[in-house]
Every structure is written in structure tokens, then in C-alpha cells.
Amino acid sequence: MDDKTRTELEAAVYRRLVEHLRSRTDVQNIDLMNLAGFCRNCLSNWMKDAADAKGVTMSKDQSREIVYGMPFDEWRSKYQKDASPDQKAAFEKSRSGH
């Protein structure tokens, strides 16, 4: 497979992942972190890191809006729930590996 095709496929996979996460607002970021070691914020941070590496100006808010499909504060007020004590404990336990 040539590099151009591979890049196009990877981009399609990324877009599909982001669309899937946008449709699953019931899945909380802390659960993603606890189970998979990454969340929507990680994806947005990686987007910003990639932009920075290419010399593309992008703010943290802009990268989050790309991933969330809306301003982060709006998503948080609509969909984010308070983390339970169990979720917080699992996060603290798994944090040492990040």
C-alpha cells in the first residue's frame, strides 16, 4: 500500500472514530480513560500536537471542538456527569501508567 492511500485510510478511520464518539454521549470520558487509557480530550490534545508539529496554528479550544463537534463547555454542560467515587478511584489507580 502506498503512503497516500494509507494516510487516506487512517484519516477515514479517525473521522469514523470521532463520529462514533460524538454519537455516544452516554460514554463518559472517565470511563474511556479507565478502560482504554484515552478519551476525547486525549484525541483533541493529539490533534493539537499534530497541528503544532506541522506549524498549523490551533488552540486547545479549536482542537476540542473538532473532536466534540461543539464547544467543549457546551458538551460538558449537556453530557458530562459527575464521576462516581468508584470511577475516580479507578482513574487514580490507572493514572500511574499514563
Model-derived features with residue positions:
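Domain-level signature for proteins that mediate thiol-based redox and metal-cofactor handling
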Residues: 1-98
